[in-house]
Amino acid sequence: MDRSSLLQLIQEQQLDPENTGFIGADTFAGLVHSHELPLDPTKLDMLVALAQSNERGQVCYQELVDLISSKRSSSFKRAIANGQRALPRDGLLDEPGLSVYKRFVRYVAYEILPCEVDRRWYFYRHRTCPPPVFMASVTLAQIIVFLCYGARLNKWVLQTYHPEYMKSPLVYHPGHRARAWRFLTYMFMHVGLEQLGFNALLQLMIGVPLEMVHGVLRISLLYLAGVLAGSLTVSITDMRAPVVGGSGGVYALCSAHLANVVMNWAGMRCPYKLLRMVLALVCMSSEVGRAVWLRFSPPLPASGPQPSFMAHLAGAVVGVSMGLTILRSYEERLRDQCGWWVVLLAYGTFLLFAIFWNVFAYDLLGADIPPPP
């Protein structure tokens, strides 16, 4: 239903005789029932919230159109937020007789979304198609690649110390910068079982719920942006080092989620959030510390520099900038967000600088690059 159709219906029913552009919430609720307009339970709750945000308990036509068509602009979301005290605080927790999958969807809603209105919106509108295939596919591909190289080299821990491992066409190496695919494909290779296990666990525990809520397009964009930023940052700041592992993408997802939790601390309803926040920060810091130790104090003799840790840090920066913008724009068009264009411009500027650096700076600076394996 568009605005003109709604206006025609209201005029036919003489629900706004003075043509104010507003209609009472109770009056519109009666219109919904009499004409069977497509409003599910969460939209009816939002209708109450919209009415609460208005001193006279009325709603403007455009907000009603947004409500019916499921479009959520920034102004629409602000109006909902102003009146959301009318909603029960823990409404979804009291839903009886849910299936196992629906209980999981409810769990995801409380883990990821900071607002009761958003949680209800997601819970009632969630569909199983398309499924969250991106994070699961990436994790499966990483495990398959690891098993193939582990079986071939008969080495499962610290694989990068094997001379044949770094010859893989997937690894990013500064001597192979012209092979542009390596700036992304290094995410399928890992130092060993310890790094793969850490990344796979976070991708499934955090990445899959984020993908369920925000969709495959946004989460895949964030993950790949973190991966690309990781290799490009290494090519600028640690010019002699190769890179392996999906840590750039993992840290982009985790940093975005943690930043979103912190900025919406009061609204998040996940249990033990302080303890879990501390545990997540300790684990992420420990992984960075392990990567720094392997880079500068390798425990085994190696034929060249070991993988850099800068991809972790670059991914975290992408997460708290681009990622936070994405997560805070749930069910809103990113192109309508001013902050999104600022972040996109900054990321594009970084890409152009990194490309220029990789094309010209190595020769101009006379960088001592180790020979490619």
Curated annotation (Swiss-Prot):
Residue ranges of the TM segments: 131-151, 196-216, 219-239, 243-263, 275-294, 307-327, 340-360
Active site, per annotation: 247 (nucleophile), 312
EC number: 3.4.21.105
Membrane protein topology class: Multi-pass membrane protein
Gene Ontology CC terms: membrane
Keywords: Hydrolase, Membrane, Protease, Serine protease, Transmembrane, Transmembrane helix
Reaction it catalyzes: Cleaves type-1 transmembrane domains using a catalytic dyad composed of serine and histidine that are contributed by different transmembrane domains
An annotated GO BP: proteolysis
Compartments it resides in: Membrane
GO MF annotation terms: serine-type endopeptidase activity
InterPro entries, sorted: EF-hand-dom_pair, Peptidase_S54_rhomboid_dom, Peptidase_S54_rhomboid_met, Rhomboid-like_sf, Rhomboid_IM_Serine_Proteases
Principal EC category: hydrolase
Top-level taxon: Eukaryota
Function in brief: May be involved in regulated intramembrane proteolysis and the subsequent release of functional polypeptides from their membrane anchors.
Family, as annotated: Belongs to the peptidase S54 family.
Protein name in the entry: Rhomboid-related protein 1
Native source species: Mus musculus
